[in-house]
Every structure is written in structure tokens, then in C-alpha cells.
């Protein structure tokens, strides 16, 4: 028996091209004091299992990390947090509270929306700036975002549970 895992479209997810302009950068740069810094990207739905709050906490407690890079969290699309279901509402509310507690204004970007068609561009934008993709999920059955990020030229960081173990081992572009 052969296991064929899900893949990713390499025509859509590919490394950045030199001197390419990324329109999504405008949505990110408005949050940041120093948008030239590399980005640490987390891209997931706002779900407690995705462990985004622990990422913000770790970033908030590391002055060295804050000096080296900005944090970009792409966590779904919203108009008003109060209109979301309880789970996503709690995650996003706490995310904003953590940004306040650690005084991360100017260092963390949390755009309100993105289109599915912009995801590949977001990965390439981060890769072009020397950034990294992080999947802080407590457990990840597969981890399609890791494949997409790797195909887009990003090094990846993930927890040592589930699919990321095999993906990072095969892609040889990250750490657990």
C-alpha cells in the first residue's frame, strides 16, 4: 500500500520572483513601525487549537525576537469580532489583549481580512523579506499550510505533533 498525501499547486505556490511588488504589503505595513524587518508569519483560522496566543506570548516575552522581526498573524476574515462565534471571538479578543499586555503595537500586524487568492502572495511576500512561517498548533493532523509555505520558499517552524514531523523531514526546510 502507498500513502499519497495531499499536495499543493506549485503553479500557485512558488518562491518569490526578484523585484516583484506585493499589493497585500499595504495591509501589513500600516500596522508596523519598521516594515522592513523580516516577518514571522502565522496563518490559520482563529481556533484555540491553533495556539496563536502562545505564539504572541512567546514573541511578547522575547525582546531579541521583537528586535529581529515583526509578527504577522493572518487569522481569518472578520468585520466585527463581536459577530463571530464564541471560539474565534475568544481567540481574537485575547490576541488583541496580548498585543496590549506586551505592548506590541508597531510590531504585530493582524489584518482584518484576506482573500483565499491572496494566500500564495502572502507567503511569497514573507519569503521575499527573509521571513519564516510558523505553525504553533498543539497538534496538526496534516498541515497543508506547511506545504504551501515550503513551496513558496519559506523556512518553517512547527510543533512536533502530527503531520509537521513528516512534512519537515521530507521538505528539509524547517525545525520542530
Language-model region placement:
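Carbohydrate-associated surface elements
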Residues: 7
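Conserved donor-binding/catalytic core segment of Leloir-type glycosyltransferases
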Residues: 28-50, 56, 71-74
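Nucleotide-activated donor-binding/catalytic signature segment of Leloir-type glycosyltransferases, i.e.
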Residues: 75-127, 131-132
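Aromatic "clamp/platform" in nucleotide-sugar-dependent glycosyltransferases that forms part
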Residues: 138
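Short glycine/serine-rich donor-binding loops of glycosyltransferases
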Residues: 143-146, 164
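Donor-sugar nucleotide-binding helix/loop cap in glycosyltransferases
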Residues: 149
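Short hydrophobic beta-strand element within catalytic cores of glycosyltransferases
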Residues: 155-158, 175
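Conserved acidic donor-binding segment of nucleotide-sugar-dependent glycosyltransferases
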Residues: 170-171, 175-176
Amino acid at each position: 500500500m502507498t500513502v499519497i498525501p495531499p499536495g499543493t499547486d506549485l503553479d500557485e505556490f512558488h518562491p518569490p520572483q526578484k523585484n516583484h511588488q506585493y499589493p497585500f504589503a499595504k495591509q501589513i505595513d500600516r500596522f508596523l513601525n519598521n516594515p522592513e524587518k523580516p516577518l514571522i508569519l502565522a496563518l490559520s483560522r482563529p481556533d484555540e487549537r491553533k495556539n496563536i496566543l502562545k505564539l504572541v506570548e512567546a514573541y511578547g516575552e522575547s525582546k531579541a525576537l521583537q528586535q529581529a522581526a515583526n509578527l504577522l498573524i493572518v487569522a481569518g476574515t472578520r468585520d466585527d469580532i463581536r459577530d463571530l462565534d464564541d471560539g474565534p471571538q475568544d481567540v481574537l479578543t485575547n490576541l488583541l489583549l496580548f498585543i496590549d499586555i506586551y505592548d506590541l503595537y508597531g510590531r504585530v500586524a493582524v489584518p482584518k481580512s484576506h482573500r483565499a487568492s491572496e494566500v500564495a502572495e502572502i507567503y511569497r511576500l514573507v519569503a521575499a523579506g527573509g521571513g519564516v512561517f510558523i505553525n504553533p498548533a498543539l497538534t496538526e493532523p496534516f498541515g497543508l499550510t506547511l506545504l504551501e509555505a515550503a513551496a513558496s520558499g519559506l523556512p518553517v517552524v512547527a510543533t512536533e505533533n502530527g503531520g509537521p514531523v513528516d512534512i519537515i523531514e521530507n521538505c528539509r526546510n524547517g525545525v520542530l
